[in-house]
Amino acid sequence: MNDPWEEGLRLFEEGHFEQALYFLEDIDPIEVPDAAYYQALCYSQLGRAEEALKSLDLVIVQESNFLKILQARMIRAFLLTTEKRYPAAEKELKGMIDEGVESVQVFSNYGYVLWATGRGKEGVAWLNRAVTLDPGNANAMNSLGYILAEEGVFLERALQLCRKALALKPENPTYLDSLGWVYHRMGQDKVAKFYLEKAVRAQPDNPDFRQHQRMVLQSLGEESITKRRS
């Protein structure tokens, strides 16, 4: 049988995260420093945020490589954001920015957190910085486009950004939802319905996607269809 570390790493690289954890969880991170990092990545992919955060905390404490620590902190901030623990996410992101970190991931995540906590103009400014730093970054473009649509401003630019993001990752359900939502905000609900239905089919349990779909169907006079399907 292969060495547990090598087998766990192989399974991780193949995208078999549950199987990878079978091997990685039994490895002492003190003996194999990278074990905690890959454990965290597996937990994150499997939606086990709390376990991922604990592993990332261990990486940050024991790792000596600055880039690995920075990567762990960025993943930690992202997980805190997805869990809607915005004060903790903001503290982590602000700390990296104050240290001089210039990263599209940090800027876009920070912008989203600011917007989510009621500071829309500041959030848009940081997302613009992210897109300027990396004009081809799909996540930054999608986040900025979605937030512009939510704010009801610069809708043509929002449409352009979300279309570019989706062109880079055509099957990404979040990008499908964002583009559908932009079309809704522009009053083009028939087009919005097409993209939102694709997003819901890809992630039927996502409450935000379903809420957007319901609102569009209601606008089209078709809300009873969604109620029958729920």
Where are these regions (language model features)?
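Residue-level recognition of tetratricopeptide repeat
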Residues: 9, 41, 78, 112, ...
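Conserved structural position within tetratricopeptide repeats
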Residues: 25-29, 61-64, 94-98, 129-132, ...
